[in-house]
Amino acid sequence: MLAEQGADVLKIEPPGGELLRLHGPNHVMSLHANCNRGKRCLAVDLSDQDGTDLMLQLAATCDVFVENFRPGVTDRLGLGYEAVKAANPDIVYCSVYGFGSTGPYCDRAVLDPVIQAITGMVAGQASPALPFPDLIRTLIADKSTAYTVAQAITAALLARERGAGGQFIEVPMLDATLAWYWPDGFSDLTQEDPTIAPRRAPDNYQLIETLDGRVVYYVATDKQVQGMWRVLGRDDLLADPNFNQISAIGKDAARAIAVGEAIHAGIAAMKTADVIEQMAAEGIPCGPVLERVEVMSDPQVMHNDIVVEWNHPTAGPLRQPRPAARFSETPGEFRPQIGVTGEHTDEILGELGYDDAAIAMLRGAGTVS
């Protein structure tokens, strides 16, 4: 994200390459490619004192230093906040932890599914049709944390620009994900003495099978619920004040369930295209449930020119999305560049003042690759 907004991002990894990179064909895994586009790659052995010294020299020239080791690891490597701050007092230093730098879980290993589970997100996916909850099949904790990190870094840079100087930022995945999930996921726990809602989607907000597929809809206003009854030909419910107003439906759990059942039954007898066309005409938010391969040919996706295809020198054709934010004066740059391990090592060392002989010496010692 920061690279797409113009930052020169340097990815530091071990001389042999990080594990995620090594799983793909020709050392290009799709997930790695999607997460590391537009970065320059430097391979450094951080267990070597020369590697540590090199990193401190590099940090002295940078605006931002980001790490996601477990708590205490960077201090042992000689690259903790105080060490980096000594090299560059104005540095914005961001540590990304699983649970935080302190507390009962701080030393535990953690990955995305664990954070999903411990934030209540997994339990929130249960429904009458799926009594046993399930994981969200995307790295939602990782990505919400990444957005939080990017936002925090830009805020710290703005504060520095206004005279605050450099600073340390801690972003635990637990905190970032819970804050991201909270507005709707914990709406019934926000106020004191809440009434805990059942673990199911509201009956005005559902995914439903049609004759030939699935659609999702959201009826949120009186006008929309009345439009739904017109789409389904339910004049009886359209005329009933208990069923044609959202407030009346929401006051009675049994009534809300009856609304959901009526909508399900009506939509089940229709084709997907007809449902979408008629709901759209009534101003009801709705859409088809697309397979991922179908997304590529969706008319709006194609119109927005979201997906870009380009050729990687070893992996071949790749598809990736453009930067989502469209700036009128300072547009983001799509950088179809995914560096191989250590691809830019010599270039970066040269910028630090190392000559060819010094670089060769570091390579020979295994400090860089």
Language-model segment annotations:
Residues 315-361:
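Flexible, small-/acidic-enriched active-site or ligand-binding loops
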Residues 16, 98-100, 173-178, 212-214, ...:
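Glycine-rich beta-alpha junction loops
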